[in-house]
């Protein structure tokens, strides 16, 4: 049984993964973006009585990241993420920066803090929540997709780098969810239309773009999150984990086929 820290447990996949891992006997630090989310999760756990505690860890906040420095963490799951959307031709670069700050730079900083203890103990496990969009980008969702492409590279390099340390066993793992009905995709897509309808190169095509993007997720989203949550479990528990875990299976096959055809 392991001590597992997960970021972004206030809702969605992170919340479900935290509850599932705790129900399997692991001690889970189910961290959230806000104090209110942590309070609600702790109140629910009074009934569940799972080996789980929740507290605020806003990945953007240095003081929050420092809270975990002395925790005995066996597995870190960098799950927290935000999305943004719009064309590279015109989106405010600060929106791009903000997405990278939350999805890439802050997880790197948190990973460095947790790794100090893991390297000292010579064991641990680092998991990054990437995405199938990290290998199969979607036009107008580039702020989000590009952060996931970055995590693919970061995960690969860190995994190889840690193997250079003698007698240290810290695998680095990527989890790549496809499209799931958590509400995240709709929120991500909607952000661009707040400003593109006012002033955009594409304003005459906004309605068509809007219909197309919402239809795409309506057709592809899986309503059963169990398939991807069990990948969190496998990544945390398997004695010899794979580098990459993908779900749903069909969406993973489509992404692989598209990458092959591009070549």
Q: What are the roles of these predicted feature ranges?
A:
Residues 87-88, 95-97:
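Substrate-binding pocket helix/loop in short-chain dehydrogenase/reductase
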Residues 24-39:
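Conserved glycine-rich Rossmann-like NAD(P)H-binding loop of the short-chain dehydrogenase/reductase
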Residues 131:
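Residue(s) in the substrate-gating loop at a strand-loop-helix junction
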Residues 111, 147-150:
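Active-site helix of classical SDR
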Residues 164-242:
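SDR active-site lid
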Residues 79-84:
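Conserved NAD(P)H cofactor-binding loop of Rossmann-fold oxidoreductase domains
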Residues 10-11:
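Conserved glycine-rich cofactor-binding loop
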């Amino acid at each position: 049984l392991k001590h597992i820290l997960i970021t972004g447990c206030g809702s969605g996949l992170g919340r479900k993964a935290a509850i599932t891992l705790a129900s399997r006997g692991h001690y889970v630090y189910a961290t959230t973006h806000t104090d209110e989310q942590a309070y609600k999760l702790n109140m629910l756990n009074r009934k569940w009585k799972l080996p789980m505690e929740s507290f605020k860890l806003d990945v953007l906040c240095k003081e929050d990241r420092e809270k975990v420095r002395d925790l005995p963490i066996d597995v870190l799951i960098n799950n927290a993420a935000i999305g943004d959307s719009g064309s590279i031709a015109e989106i405010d670069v600060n929106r791009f920066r903000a997405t990278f700050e939350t999805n890439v730079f802050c997880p790197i900083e948190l990973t460095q803090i947790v790794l100090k203890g893991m390297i000292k103990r010579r064991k641990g496990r680092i998991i990054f929540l990437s995405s199938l969009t990290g290998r199969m980008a979607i036009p107008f969702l580039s702020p989000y997709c590009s952060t996931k492409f970055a995590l693919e590279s970061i995960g690969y390099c860190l995994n190889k780098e840690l193997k250079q340390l003698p007698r240290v066993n810290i695998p680095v793992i990527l989890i790549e969810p496809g499209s799931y009905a958590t509400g995240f995709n709709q929120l991500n897509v909607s952000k661009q239309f707040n400003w593109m309808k006012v002033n955009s190169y594409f304003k005459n095509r906004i309605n068509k773009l809007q219909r197309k993007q919402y239809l795409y997720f309506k057709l592809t989203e899986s309503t059963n999150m169990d398939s991807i949550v069990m990948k969190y479990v496998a990544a945390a528990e398997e004695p010899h984990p794979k580098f990459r875990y993908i779900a749903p299976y069909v969406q993973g096959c489509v992404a692989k086929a598209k990458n092959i055809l591009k070549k």
